Amino acid sequence: YEIHERLVGSEMCIRDRKKSVYGTVSYGEAVTILYFRNVLKFLGPEDLRDEIEKDVWELKNLDIKIRSNPIYNVKTLDFRKIYQPDIREECKKAVYMNLQYEAIGTVQGELTIMRIFSEYLQKEYSKIKSCSEIDREVLEEFLIHLSTKDTSHSANSSYVISLRRQLETIGKIYSYERLEHLFINTDIPPEVNAEFRVYSDDEMKRLNAEITQMDVQIARCLLIHQMLGTRISDTLTLRPDCLTRENGQDMIEIYQVKTKRYKKPISKELAKLLQSSIEYTQEKFGDTEYIFVNEKEPDRPMQYMAIKTKVMSMIQEKQLKDDHGELFGFGTHMFRHYYGVKLTEMHLDDWTIARLLGHKRLNNVQHYRKMSNQRMADETREVRQRMSDIIYMSLARWGEEYEQIRQDAGIE
């Protein structure tokens, strides 16, 4: 605190202007302040408390095997923004229990909604100190607040499910029976299906023209990702021994982070591109577990956020825009959509498409077929309109017997 006051008195900047990869501006603590925080932490006495007693957990210090996606770098869990001390301790116990059965990403979602809930309680129900005091009325008011909040996560069913899971776990641990029966099924809003978008051929050409000018291994990674049609996590965790040949056909083995491993045939060109990527990594880092590695930590895969930052910086620098005149976002899933739509245009059956995309079920294929039909309609609309105009002009010369046709078509 004294250092902070001295810096303020010296007119040294204590807040920095930061620009995100999306071009948005925010303000945060200056590098100088963060530096002093780290110095004080290093020089301060060692915290000998058990890890679960601390307000910030180092995951590596927990006696639990953490289930994580290796393309995301999650090192800590932060409870400091759960403002009520008793609720914070209750939340810690629940998080520790859930970590033994759930992936770290799921637990992070539960912790995020608990922070939002804690902030709401602090403002609207400041007398509530423990989860044992939360009743149905408080919950309903919060859910209304959540559903009307102007954020991208408003009324998101996953948030409500995460809150329910967290409060019910707390109820079981502390025998707060009320929490186990607090929610009813109608509390969970229906999921809003996101618009299923896909890049046009022109958009893909513009993107790839710039991607190929980026760092060679990142460019290879993104092109391979497009050609495989995999999830980005599956691409970034490809193994150096993934390539095989079966009956003269190049094959690739893909380890799906979410489900299982599977094989699929690939072209000779893609096999060569993969081989070049493997050789690049071996020459630069030696034997590694993954083809695309984190340069600072070669034992880990290339990180999703590192790729995202570089691609978005390129888009901002080049002012690269889509067909609607908007700057491109970083949509690795859009490459997968493009791949899926192309498979439907080849008239493959649903089972084959699902296999090539690594889907366990066939029901997702309908989205690709629907988008393919929509694209066909959009791309042929001008031609179909010209054909219709020619027909209507002919009808206009054919007399009264076709008057009803003209009226039905809305033609003057």
PLM features: residue spans?
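Basic, Lys/Arg- and aromatic-enriched nucleic-acid-binding interface segment
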Residues: 202-232, 336
